[in-house]
Regions:
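Alpha-helical cap/lid subdomain in secreted, periplasmic
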Residues: 2-134
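Conserved catalytic region of serine esterases and O-acyltransferases that act on ester linkages
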Residues: 112-169
Length: 169
């Protein structure tokens, strides 16, 4: 069973031009599927940085993809970490630049920044619990945020695939 799941899709959902509906459906699919499989799984949503986000945060704007994923986080009462905002602020403050960070797929310095932020989060969260505390199941809200989200997705053997018109093996 999974005890702790970190989920991040802001960079790819934005970079692959998924619409707002699909951003919510995809993120809810991951979160809901995980909680239905094991209601005791703790989930933390992460928001990594994309080049275009660097222009938004200094203007006080939050990228739509992050707002869409936050709808899911709020609905399922899971915490999120806005690493994109932190990185943008630190670049604006001159602590490092985009090249030093390593870009969308961070170099070692960028990974260290993400790791330090997550270590801080875990230290904070662990300070609130004791090893003797019982693991509690999370409630899964009904109905889903989007009834067409992808939480019922599954893998299928290729032999089960039926090709629609215009496709061939």
């Amino acid at each position: 069973d999974i005890d702790l799941l970190f989920v991040e899709a802001a960079v790819n959902d934005h970079g692959n031009y998924f619409c707002a509906i699909d951003q919510v459906r995809g993120m809810e699919g991951i979160v809901r599927h995980a909680l239905l499989a094991n209601p005791s799984t703790d989930i933390v949503m992460l928001h990594f940085i994309h080049t275009l986000f660097l222009e938004m945060y200094p203007k006080g704007r939050v990228p739509d993809v992050i707002l869409n994923h936050e709808r899911v986080a709020n609905y399922y009462l899971i915490p999120s970490v806005h690493l994109a905002h932190e990185v943008s602020d630190r670049i604006a403050a001159g602590e490092f630049d985009w090249e030093q960070f390593g870009g969308i797929h961070p170099a070692e310095p960028g990974h260290k920044i993400y790791a330090a932020s997550l270590a801080h989060l875990l230290d904070k969260m662990w300070s609130r619990v004791s090893v003797s505390d019982a693991v509690e199941a999370h409630s899964v809200p009904e109905p889903p945020l989007d009834v067409n989200s992808y939480y019922n997705a599954s893998f299928a053997d290729i032999s089960q695939v039926k090709l629609s018109k215009g496709w061939e093996q």
